[in-house]
Amino acid sequence: MSDSPFFPDHQPIQLPKIKIRRPKVGPGAITIAVLVLLGLFVYAASSFWTEILWFQQMHATRILLTRWGVIAGLAVVGVVLSVAVLRIMIGLAHRHRVSSKRGEAAANLRQYQDAIEPFKKLAFWLVALVLGIPAGLRLAEGWQTVLTWLNATPFGKTDPIFGWDISFFVFTLPFLELVVSFLLHLVFLSLIVSIVASYLYGGLQVVPRPHATAPVRRHLGILAAIASVIIGVQYWIGRYSLLTQSGDNIDGAMYADVNATLPAHSILAAISIAVAALFLVAAFRGTWRLPTIGVVVTVVAALVIGGAYPALIEQFRVRPNARSLNAQYIQHNIDATLEAYGLDDLDYRTYDATTTAQPGQLREDSESTSQIRLLDPQVIRKTVQQLQQSRPYYSFDSGFFVDRYTINGERRDTVISMRELNLAGLSQEQQNWVNRHTVYTHGFGVVAAYGNTITSDGLPAYWEQSIPSKGEIGEYEPRVYFSQSAPDYSIVGGPEGTPNQELDYPDDNAPGGQVSTTFKGNGGPSVGNVWNKLLYSIKFGSTDIFFSSQTNEESQILYDRDPLLRVAKVAPYLTLEQKAYPAVVDTDGDPSTPKRLVWVVDAYTTTDSYPYAQHQSLSSSTVDSRSQSVGQYIQENSINYMRNSVKAIVDAYDGSVRLFQWDEKDPILSTWMKIYPGSVESKQNISADLMGHLRYPEDMFKVQRDLLTSYHVRDASDFYTGGDRWRLAEETSTAATANGVSTATMSSLQQQAVRVQPPYYLTMQMPGQQSAEFSLTSVFVPGGESKREAMAGFLAVDSETGSEAGKVREGYGKLRLIALPSSTTVPGPGQIQNAYDTNQTIASQLNVLNLSDSTVIRGNLLTLPVGGGLLYVQPVYIQGSGGANYPVLRFVLTAFGNRVGFAPTLAESLDQTFGGDSAAKVAGGDQSADKNKGGGDQQNQAESEPSKQLASALQDANQAIQDGQNALKNNDWAAYGESQKRLNDALTKAIDAQKKLDAQSGSGS
């Protein structure tokens, strides 16, 4: 009879006995199984073994094996511990099983027990593995945390609350949180598994009333006590995490955190330990009442002491007195933020700028005015593409960069770019595997132009150009096998004496119209044997690699060719600059060897655990109107500590990577150098030539300038009121539009950032600086909702590293901030742009160009603190209609105070602004350099006449406008009519001249 009151005649369910027959395994099945296993092994090897080959070729095997070894070790520890604990929990539940219970539920459980009994060991291990493996793998995710804790380097600075060294928060605290999180997860999982297993084996009863046998009670009680202890530890270490937490506006522990939340965590930790003791008592004394009360008390205490009490303190104690009560904690935040981001040595001064422009005012600023950069790297890309591309399969996709080179003994600002390979430029007939992966393998050379000089036709004045490369650089290795736009892989190399397969560069005088070459370096793993060819065929999904006759015993496969990716792989702990920039340098200091073409990569060590420092989002701080993408090699998006600790170079020919310790005081880099000894070279190994091309990194500067919109205020009380907040100036140039940038595919963050003016590299002298130096600059305007565009501050950092081997020039990295007094209104970039737009002379002349179907493109608006005030300079480019046309520099806009200038040359424009004679020294007097032809002698000669006609016509139009205005003032209608006739004639001539220039530029490629 059944014990069930509802179904008295119900009989227990009888499970049918199933006889399992073992299938016969024949030789065919064994063969198939072996082949499947072999296939899986080869497929796996195409990933892990090719990765080993890549790191071996890079001489960085230790970096890979250390990472893999630690990950594997932690995974094994985590999985073994998790699986073992869970298996023990299930085994204990089975050992403490009860088989004498009566009733329907007990009968059904016995049937489950009987059914699983023959396979119990397998079932127990299977459950432990299924649940334990994912739990254990969680530990491996913290491999970097474990390594840095084991090799931690002290910061030598302490936090203001506990007095611990900063390294505790950066290295030790994350490790403790990792361990506590893993253990707590494992204990709770063990509790759940133990409860379920004990129920299935009768040791735990749910109905008609909860009941546990003594062994099960001890089992669960001890587990609950362990969980309670771990929770107590979690509360205790949570006290330290308060100092690194993010706040609504200010990060770190404020008054309520220190005086309410922190003590609450201590109390809750003590309560948790007490509850653990109650669980132990219950485990051996048989009553659950006390631990149940303890759990309830813990929950209530967490809600009241940990939640409600701090909230009440914040609402009724702090908010009415926040300025005074939070003052010392805000000061902690200010001090820590300045230290964490390298802003503690900022040179801050008030700049009483004049807005009056007078003749001769720039006489004392010749060092700055002579290096005013007229070439906008963003705008001239299309110009250089048309004139220097040479063939459709070349491009300048990585962009143009501002650098400085010594030419004829003079240090000159330069705009430079690599000529990279672009397979998209091949015709459809050329798009075959042989061409894409064995013939078209590399780009060739660089194009470099003076930053402050143009030809008479508005073209860049090149000092290095053409294929083969010719100019002022001298002998260097020009082949670009490694770049951002390089093919996904190329197969290169061959024995001595075999025919060259790779296209080197086009040459009309060579057989077939091209010169061929063979790669001679050590740039990639070998594919000279069947095994490697098989692995790489699978890796890249191409049978051509395996069957191609183009490969030989000396063949190498080049892949992972993006310079940023190569640095990221050999230094996975670094956050990288969004872009690498090119340089032609003597890397070994030996003048007898050719120079090398390299990519320079700035790299950072970051953390989000610096106590009291303000958190910054890298994805928002580093995006502006000209970098409308977020770097993909960001290790941490939210950070509160940043150092430019490493300078890396990637050889464009063989892809070799060298890392140099740039910041020798950074504890985070020192820690990683202990982990990977020998992977980072000393700064002393930097050659003199390479040192001269390093610079202050742009992304670091962007983060710093973003912080200085608020943290230029050093007093806690003033900081809290926020009355002197700034914001970054908005972009005024039209370069982004000219280069086809569309906001349609941008995120909301990027659409907002598109308005922010980027920082600019230029040579200039700041107030208090001894001489003009290569600098990185940015402009601030007042914050708030008023959207005033007046100038509020100007920031510059000394970016000149010097040219002494192994030694950085004194003064490098010095940040200088000048603040404009509120009593003086100095026009900001937006107001200057408005002055340009509303100036009748400027507007009329630009309208003439628009009438001729040309496009007016305004370049970067540069700001320089010269003449006792602030000078603005903006190049104006004209681009004809049609896809083959390109921008040429036709005019220069200048402004100082309320005076503006607009003329074909910088010198003329400055003279207009400063009453006829600025006394400024500019490049070549009128910034033209016909001896450095921008597009070839014949083109310059052809363009000279229309250029002169356009300039003359615009001058006539300007004069006619002025005469007409004077005639109106004098009510001389006859003179006004005559001036209008002259204006119409001048406009007609200007339009005709511009059309001729457009036609010539359209055929200039």
Predicted segments, located by residue:
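Soluble extracytoplasmic regions of secretory-pathway and membrane proteins
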Residues: 3-22, 31-970, 974-1003
